[in-house]
Amino acid sequence: MFYWLIELTNTFPSLAMFRGLLNVFRYITFRTGGAVVTGALFVFLFGPWIIDHLRLRQGKGQPIRADGPQSHIISKKGTPTMGGLMILSGLVVSTVLWANPLNPYVWIVLAVTLGFGFVGFYDDYLKVTKQSHSGFAGRARILIEAGIALVACYALVRLGRDPSSTGLAIPFFKDLVIKFGWMYVIFGAFVIVGAGNAVNLTDGLDGLAIVPVMIASASFGLIAYLAGNAVFSDYLQIHYVAGTGELAVLCGAVLGAGLGFLWFNAPPASIFMGDTGSLALGGMLGSIAVAVKHEIVLAVIGGLFVLEAVSVIVQVASFKLTGKRIFKMAPIHHHFEQLGWTEPQIVIRFWIISVMLALVGLSTLKLR
């Protein structure tokens, strides 16, 4: 919306004297900074009201797994969930205010984010109303997520109108691209659905998921800015995707809204993100990675999410095949709880790992 202020100087000659001042709204970097501040302020201001409303509506709050760490039954009982509504509200308001409203990439990513958020909201709703840890049926949930992701990937490929838009670039190699053709739509959907559920599995401790999400968002905001700039992408020899630079504004909105949410989610949490937030944010990261053609880099920057997801897959597969569990409990953050690590130790150490993985992922931009 603010992006259009510069157009007012062209429509109304009397405002021409303000053109120099309003010209800053042309710059993605300025609007990204504005999105960060707006997202954070929105959640800071409206967060307490949302938390009180959810606590009143939910009563007992999110049901705690009986087979999970016993400490959670006492420390986390009664805490409301669906805190993702705070993040999504701040994200949407900030993005609408600061992003170019004519950019299709912004709307596609927002659609995926809100679509996954709705699926997560319904899952949270069932858990709270039934007071059961089992919510939305797994297969039905995955099918809906896959449908949203397939439509989004098809739209992204159509936007690209370039043979490379259906290819997979390999980091560290300048010209190595695996060409999928239209099968890329299926691959891209797998990336989006996988990212959504990986973040969902990570969200098991206070503050554990939101900071790695913010780190990944900041990283992909930079990648989107570079990939959407013809000069920078040519210098770095990465795939140029015209228009994706605007996704940096959306990433800034996520960073700001995430900072606001962390204020209330810091241990001991006043509210949980819930599937409403974790599925939405994971789907957002996946769709941005597909849009800017850095799918493999997402697996590096979001390596913590990959680790959490793989730990669950390995645990389930091992138990079904051998009757034995590899980890004391999955996802892997619960394994460390069982080993005696305190919740703050796990959370902060996982944050450190996320920072290191982000630096490794960003280094792939230059190492070609």
UniProtKB/Swiss-Prot annotation:
InterPro entries documented for this protein: Glycosyl_transferase_4 (IPR000715), PNAcMuramoyl-5peptid_Trfase (IPR003524), PNAcMuramoyl-5peptid_Trfase_CS (IPR018480)
Keyword Membrane found: yes
Enzyme's top EC category: transferase
One GO CC term on file: plasma membrane
Reactions it catalyzes: UDP-N-acetyl-alpha-D-muramoyl-L-alanyl-gamma-D-glutamyl-meso-2,6-diaminopimeloyl-D-alanyl-D-alanine + di-trans,octa-cis-undecaprenyl phosphate = di-trans,octa-cis-undecaprenyl diphospho-N-acetyl-alpha-D-muramoyl-L-alanyl-D-glutamyl-meso-2,6-diaminopimeloyl-D-alanyl-D-alanine + UMP
UniProt-annotated location(s): Cell inner membrane
Main location: membrane
Pfam entry (one): MraY_sig1
Similarity comment text for this entry: Belongs to the glycosyltransferase 4 family. MraY subfamily.
Name used for this protein in its record: Phospho-N-acetylmuramoyl-pentapeptide-transferase
Species: Bradyrhizobium sp. (strain BTAi1 / ATCC BAA-1182)
